[in-house]
A protein has these predicted regions:
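ABC transporter nucleotide-binding domain
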Residues: 165-256
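Flexible, glycine-rich phosphate/dinucleotide-binding loops
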Residues: 84, 206, 282
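Charged/polar, solvent-exposed surface patches and flexible loops
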Residues: 99, 111-114, 167, 171, ...
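ABC transporter nucleotide-binding domains
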Residues: 2-4, 9-195, 199-201
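Generic alpha-helical secondary structure signal
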Residues: 15, 69, 107-111, 163, ...
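Amphipathic, soluble alpha/beta structural segments
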Residues: 16, 194, 199-204, 274-278, ...
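Short loop/turn segments at beta->alpha junctions
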Residues: 89, 210, 276-279
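Short, charged/small-residue-rich alpha-helical element at the C-terminal edge
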Residues: 219-295, 299
Length: 299
């Protein structure tokens, strides 16, 4: 488990991370999302022990991270601007990382390189940006650490590659102790990968939620009722997060179980009723608006 408690980090007069508190459980894919400049990379670097918090503390499996070699054996960190030595091939990188991760899984590396259609003996300098990111994910998984920290690693990956990585992560989580932490400025890129998402804004954690729990407790229903009085009654009876109208069509986003919400709407004898799917972005819009923020100002 990763525990971030009241962590702050400033660069001159700019506070990149401000009293951030966050818990990341084992065997979940955790997404750390926020706009550019929200503090994601700084927080991830503090988790990786690259930077020391000015205030607060970070523990991985009960150990302080900064200047702790035992704690650092537990994770592999993929930077947003990872460096590859000149003329190195993918196979050369394996030799480099095996010095730090002796448990590196060579057989799995060969299998994944073939699965992702990457050439082991090809110079990395000839790889595209997406190919380099795929290579780093493969190396990170094969390093066989408990935690994998990814800073904007999924930025620009196409849907097919994201699905491949999602399947890879799911297989690793099923077979061993494995927890990926993914920082991204793009909610849509995290939607089909993460189990849990933390929203970072101005250096602080605005909210941290389990996605299935959020989807279970927030629903969007469109319906047509016989009159405005029924609409007003319904808005009082439900935990309404958002109401939209298009002519006679009423769209309600409300908190609660699907059955409880539908039961209250059905009691009004609607002329029409339909449950609509909610995207991760729509769920976050609802949550942040209730907290007094507009998501368009966060991203």
């Amino acid at each position: 488990m990763i525990e971030v408690k009241e962590c702050s980090k400033a660069f001159g007069t700019v506070k990149a991370v401000n009293k951030a508190t966050l818990d990341i459980g084992d065997r979940e894919v955790f997404g750390l999302v926020g706009s550019n400049g929200a503090g994601k990379s700084t927080l991830l670097r503090m988790m990786a022990g690259i930077m020391k918090p000015d205030e607060g503390q970070i523990q991985i499996d009960g150990m302080q991270v900064y200047e702790n070699e035992e704690a650092k054996k537990l994770f592999f960190y993929i930077s947003d601007d990872s460096y590859f030595p000149a003329n190195y091939t993918a196979w050369d990188m394996v030799g480099f990382y095996r010095n730090f991760y002796p448990q590196f899984r060579i057989k799995l590396f060969h299998e994944l390189m073939e699965q992702f259609h990457l050439e082991e003996k090809r110079k990395i300098s000839t790889f595209s940006k997406g190919m380099k990111k795929q290579l780093l994910v493969i190396i990170g998984v094969c390093a066989a650490t408990k935690y994998l920290f990814c800073d904007e690693t999924f930025d620009g990956l196409d849907p097919v590659m994201r699905q491949a990585v999602k399947s890879l992560f799911a297989a690793e989580i099923m077979n061993r102790e494995f927890t990926p932490v993914i920082a991204s400025h793009n909610l849509r890129e995290l939607e089909d990968i993460c189990d849990h998402v933390g929203l970072l804004h101005k250096g602080g954690i605005l909210l941290s939620k389990d996605l299935e729990d959020m989807k279970f407790h927030i629903h969007k229903i469109q319906c047509v009722l016989s009159g405005r009085e029924q609409e007003k009654e319904l808005e009082k009876e439900l935990q309404v997060l958002k109401v939209q109208r298009q002519g006679s069509l009423l769209m309600i986003t409300a908190r609660g179980t699907r059955s409880a919400i539908m039961e209250k709407i059905q009691a009004k004898n609607p002329l029409f009723m339909e449950v609509l799917p909610l995207t991760l972005e729509e769920i976050f819009i609802s949550e942040t608006e209730v907290a007094g923020y507009e998501i368009k100002n966060l991203f």
